[in-house]
Amino acid sequence: HFPDTWATQWFGVGKMIHSLFLINCSGDIFLEKHWKSVVSQSVCDYFFEAQEKAADVENVPPVISTPHHYLISIYRDKLFFVSVIQTEVPPLFVIEFLHRVADTFQDYFGECSEAAIKDNVVIVYELLEEMLDNGFPLATESNILKELIKPPTILRSVVNSITGSSNVGD
């Protein structure tokens, strides 16, 4: 039994996020995560076209329709979080989820920046894996995630780099 949250409402809708791309202000895709099947980075070309047409980064449309996908994005801390959806989904659910991802990175790493994400890439992928199960939002609450995946510490980072272990809780 799942708690009655916005995320579980999605299970009834039967929709999912296929991929997530993190893009910096220079237009570089520096992280991508795929859940169902790999979606080519070329899908982001539609996003880049919309970005070029926008007066500034704040004016990039949050929902972009392409021939085969919908791109739903947010702009936070000089980063674009671009999700790829294959079927119609209430955009606010996806936007709320993307904000929760950014909030989680902020909570775990002290900032939601390209450098922090790259420095903690293993934890980032572990978090995304826990937050979405086959593209469906699952564990999005920080206190639950911290039970599953231990936040980084300097000591843990050194130990993990020496032993090759991860931050997944026991």
Go through each PLM region and give its residues.
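Acidic, low-complexity cytosolic segments
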Residues: W6, W10-D170
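Intrinsic-disorder-associated, low-complexity terminal segments enriched in Asp/Asn/His/Tyr and depleted
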Residues: H1-D4
